[in-house]
Amino acid sequence: MKKYNKSIGFYGEDLSAKFLKKEGYSILEKNFNCSSGEIDIIAIKDEIISFIEVKSRFSNSFGNPKESVTCSKQGRIINAAKYYLHVKKLYNYYIRFDVIEVNFHIDSSKYELNFLKDAFRV
């Protein structure tokens, strides 16, 4: 089941990246990892760097996807973002923390994508 969930997650991230590109974002990184944590997508548009957590689900039986971005998860994303900005020397940008929810339909290939800008703050 874990491997299946991981492949659903990667598919959701790919769909999210395509959506962001259509919306005029440039993708800076996908699956950025450091000792502080992981960021699914880092994108930029209009001088705003967005650190994006993608949550993909077939069902809301465990709550909606955004609810799984807990305070501790937010902290790890924030710390990873600080590290990324420092390493890349990106100091003169606005930043934002977003969540993209991808809800797949079990009985078809359809999905719903919900882009939650400024989902949490430092």
Swiss-Prot record:
Superkingdom, taxonomy of origin: Bacteria
InterPro entries for the chain: Restrct_endonuc-II-like, tRNA_endonuc-like_dom_sf, UPF0102_YraN-like
GO MF annotation terms: nucleic acid binding
The family this protein is said to belong to: Belongs to the UPF0102 family.
Protein name: UPF0102 protein CPF_1959
Organism: Clostridium perfringens (strain ATCC 13124 / DSM 756 / JCM 1290 / NCIMB 6125 / NCTC 8237 / Type A)
